[in-house]
From Swiss-Prot:
Signal peptide positions (record): none
Organism taxonomic ancestry: Eukaryota, Viridiplantae, Streptophyta, Embryophyta, Tracheophyta
Coiled coil: none
Annotated Gene Ontology cellular component terms: nucleus
Locus of motif Bipartite nuclear localization signal: 146-157
Biased composition (Low complexity): 1-19
Gene it is expressed from: CID11
PANTHER family to which the protein is assigned, alphabetical: POLYADENYLATE-BINDING PROTEIN-INTERACTING PROTEIN 11, SERINE/ARGININE-RICH SPLICING FACTOR
Tissues of expression: Expressed in cauline leaves, stems, immature siliques and primary inflorescences.
Protein name: Polyadenylate-binding protein-interacting protein 11
Amino acid sequence: MAVVETGAAATAADAGGVVIQPPPSSPPSSMTSQDSGVSSDDQNHHSRIDQVLRHDQGLYSKIGSHVARSDGVDGGESFKRDMRELQELFSKLNPMAEEFVPPSLNKQGGNGVNGGFFTSAGSFFRNNGFAGTGNGGYGNENGGFRRKKSFGQGKRRMNARTSMAQREDVIRRTVYVSDLDQQVTEEQLAGLFVSCGQVVDCRICGDPNSVLRFAFIEFTDEEGAMTALNLSGTMLGFYPVKVLPSKTAIAPVNPTFLPRTEDEREMCARTIYCTNIDKKVTQSDVKIFFESFCGEVYRLRLLGDYQHSTRIAFVEFVMAESAIAALNCSGVVLGSLPIRVSPSKTPVRPRSPRHPMH
């Protein structure tokens, strides 16, 4: 049961407050006997509401404004004016703003840190409505939940997505060519596919399980790669090649290893790249193997590490014909593994002499 009085009390009610006046001690003569009879329950109800209003007025006074809730007009107008000012102040706040946490408190758990608060029951509530346990729940050891990703992490993720998109674009522009004759060079292979579009890169690889080889050809656009599929079945050397869309991109070569001069390009023509070499095989074993089948070896570099189960080698022959003959050794077992031989993209440069340490 709520009775709203007119005048100043009604003005305060319009401003958002509900003002209840207690019944007069002696009812006016215009009231009926039914109106004058107020039960003790109603009086108790009015008394409780008055206590709430007095408590509300005390809280309002604490935030810096004194409101006189009296029967005078000034008190109601003052309350209404203060409420308008308070509403104007609240309207200027940004509801999307995040809570500022000083660096000294950012590493500590506690009330209000990381945009949440602890209840008396020990539960931790975030501003987004998610609840966890007071000791951190699914969060970190500091009692807070995982922080938002930093700008650096977001930038790295963006770079990773960009890199992945670029890689997928390269794959769509690349074709896979199989059943390549051992005598076919990369120049001859690129010359066949140049009619389909501009060739960006051409890479021939050895197959240890076959005397034939395979290759990857990258074009400047997808149209070139699509046109290249029509060349499947074309005779190149002594075998018809198979052309399929590639599932991988050509692995880039470190540009610092590429030939820099005409002499180094001539060295590449005499050099082969050998992979899948048994770790028990020594450098002398590799040299003896290729000299027995192909010709004199001028320089050899055997490389390996503890992370890979096999090793690789760059073998430079005295004659370019020996390097071509070495391509036929792909698939031959050396030690306990079949080796893979392909033309080298890089020359075997002599090691620079080390300066003595003083």
